[in-house]
Amino acid sequence: MKELLSIHSAPAQHWVGDGFPVHSVFGYTGAEVAQRSPFLLLDYVAPCEFAVNLGQRRGVGAHPHRGFETVTIVFDGEVEHRDSTGAGGVIGPGDVQWMTAGGGIVHEEFHSTAYSRQGGLFEMVQLWVNLPAQAKMTPAGYQGIAAERIPNVRLTGGTGKVRLIAGEFAGFSGPARTHTPMNVWDVRVDSEQSVRLDQPAGWTTLIVVLSGTLTVNDSATLSAKEMATLSTRGAGVRIEASRASRWLLLAGEPIAEQIGRASCRERVYSGV
């Protein structure tokens, strides 16, 4: 079994722009950053309600990224994206956007026009994934992954399923193209049960709880907006859910390289 290394609880909510009240479950600073490689950051917008908005749409205006990828997973609501490559679109419930910043990209993210006009429930995750040195300057790109393209794989002997965004599970493959080997799974169970979700030895493994209560490898119990970091040693991952629960399983081959941060916006924009 993989050893439980740590449990982390997300700090208090803060706003990204005026459209995204996020809990930053983890980021790319601190002593444990190497234990989370290749994953850099995860922001979670827990279920919330937005009122009808007929004025300026809520969101985040144009801003640059470079050297990594952003993965936006929408559960409820809609996000509209545009970027400097000319790509864009609306990400609705169940959809995923996998954007490669690579050598540099400028993009903006707002509530869609349709969602703004009707308001309602909103929930999403944004995950940042590091790129290895040889891919840092790869051309910027955009993968728009509609919900119907994502396999929903039933868990053996249970009432849950794995939405396979990236990687492999039970003979199925996720649609996202990745630069390093990884699994990005959206897992949901409908009742109390125990499941095995083993990951390759040598891989980073993170369990991020979105709802419900989980016990990980008989070691610790987690609730919503908490994350377990497991060791790269071993392969076993056992999850016991005490009730209906949802979590993200993030696993991947670590990138054994130092993480650099741009010293100024001009340096980031220079790659665009």
Task: For every predicted segment, state its role.
Residues 1-265:
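Jelly-roll (double-stranded beta-helix
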